[in-house]
Design a protein with these regions (language model features):
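C-terminal motif of bacterial Sec signal peptides marking the signal peptidase cleavage site
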Residues: 14-18
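N-terminal pre-ligand scaffold of iron-sulfur
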Residues: 22-100, 111-115, 131-148
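Short hydrophobic/aromatic-rich motifs at helix boundaries and adjacent loops
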Residues: 19-20, 107
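Positively charged n-region of N-terminal signal peptides that target proteins for export
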Residues: 1-5
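Short cysteine/histidine-rich metal-coordination sites, predominantly Zn2+-binding motifs
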Residues: 99-109, 120-133
């Protein structure tokens, strides 16, 4: 019995000690935006989101820093990402533009990101680069609530 207790304590000790705690790197380019945007999918403006794979862009007066890209990724799941390119300080060129299944940064470096995952598609070298900033989406019937 004592051997069993010692073994359990030993296993617990190494399990706790072997956990790696890494803090995610905060994006230094984009400030935090606070908002809560209700979207009614029955409205004509948002009806493209009723079909899987479709995306729309909301202007920044509704939420986000420069706006919000919203995509229906299927199975009643939606993803929402910041329009500002995450690898630039907000400027006149640092918006991303929807083009099919990706969004492209308008600055000269031409970063491209997936609208389904937010991942940078043309990552090169070992430089620290950021994926799109994702916002939370809650679905209730035909309503979407996008918030941060």
């Amino acid at each position: 019995m004592r051997l069993l207790n010692t073994s359990i304590a030993f296993i617990l000790f190494f399990t706790v000690c072997s956990c790696e705690s890494t803090t995610p790197v905060q994006n230094p380019f984009l400030p935090k935006a606070s908002f809560n945007v209700p979207i009614d999918l029955n409205l004509p403006l948002y009806s493209p989101l009723q079909n899987t794979g479709n995306s729309i862009t909301l202007p920044n007066n509704l939420g986000g820093i420069k706006g919000i890209h919203i995509t229906n990724v299927g199975f009643s799941t939606f993803r929402a990402f910041e329009v500002s390119c995450p690898n630039h300080n907000p400027s006149s060129c640092s918006s991303t533009e929807l083009q099919g299944s990706q969004v492209n940064c308008q600055c000269e470096d031409g970063f491209s990101y997936s609208v389904f995952t937010g991942q940078l598609l043309n990552r090169q070298g070992s430089e620290t680069l950021f994926d799109l900033t994702e916002y939370r989406v809650r679905t209730e019937g035909t309503m979407l609530y996008i918030f941060n």
